[in-house]
A protein has these predicted regions:
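Active-site glycine-centered loops adjacent to acidic/histidine catalytic or metal-binding residues
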Residues: 14-15, 43-44, 127, 162-163
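N-terminal active-site segment of His-dependent metallophosphoesterases
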Residues: 1-25
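Short acidic, glycine-rich surface-loop motifs adjacent to enzyme active sites
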Residues: 13, 113-134
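Extended active-site neighborhood of metal-dependent phosphoesterases/phosphodiesterases
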Residues: 21-118, 138-158, 169-204
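Residues at the starts of beta-strands that form the adenosine-phosphate
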Residues: 9, 37, 121
Length: 204
């Protein structure tokens, strides 16, 4: 694949089977036939809504794919995937989660990045957008500002995000450094209702 210029790995950005954990095995079987390694990022729809705590709600995802926070290197890039969805329980989909990074997660990220050379490209993957969320008083963006501070220490940093179902680019300026946030459209496009687009965007 590499010699032909094709991707040698991929990464999802959450909401993989849309509240249907019984489909994990089908999804894994389908991805196993792609002949490339695929890393997973957890989204709000990957949490079990029958649970009442964040850790319990994410346990099923972790049993399928491993830790929600991890990192790896590819070439000159250091890639981090983190869970920035707090599942808090609730009666409606809009009230059962919030966005952000815990203090413990932020410390994990700080320690992880301390082993990365400052001239490296850092790619940070999560589910919920950072754009507009740099205030520590905003409970939907807790510690996102701290993440941006850490990313600003590197030569180049990009944030890869899902969640919103539409494409958007946002540029954060942090400590004099530009950090690019890429919000990616969903594979289902306009909820499977529009004309099929073979390259995957904008309509799935």
């Amino acid at each position: 694949f590499k010699a032909k210029g094709r991707a040698v790995y991929g990464i999802t950005l959450g909401d993989i089977v849309f509240d249907t954990p019984d489909l994990w095995s089908n999804m894994k079987e389908a991805m196993a036939n792609r002949n490339l390694t695929i890393f997973q990022t957890i989204g709000n729809h990957d949490h079990l809504k029958t649970e009442t705590s964040d850790d319990k709600a994410a346990a099923n995802f972790e049993s399928q794919f491993g830790p929600r926070n991890y990192s790896f290197n590819r070439g000159n890039a250091h890639i981090v995937s983190m869970d920035n969805v707090f599942y808090v329980g609730g009666s409606t989909p809009s009230s059962n989660y919030k966005g952000g990074i815990t203090d413990q997660q932020l410390e994990w990220l700080r320690q992880d990045l301390s082993h990365v050379a400052k001239d490296k490209l850092v790619i940070f993957c999560a589910h919920m957008p950072f754009r507009g969320g740099t205030s520590e008083t905003d409970e939907s963006h807790m510690n996102h500002a701290g993440v941006l501070d850490l990313l600003s220490e590197f030569a180049e940093a990009h944030i890869m995000i899902g969640h919103t179902h539409y494409q958007q680019k946002y540029i954060h300026t942090r400590n004099g450094k530009k950090i690019f946030e890429h919000i990616h459209g969903a594979a289902c496009g306009a909820w499977w209702t529009s004309t099929l687009c073979a390259d995957g965007t904008p309509n799935g």
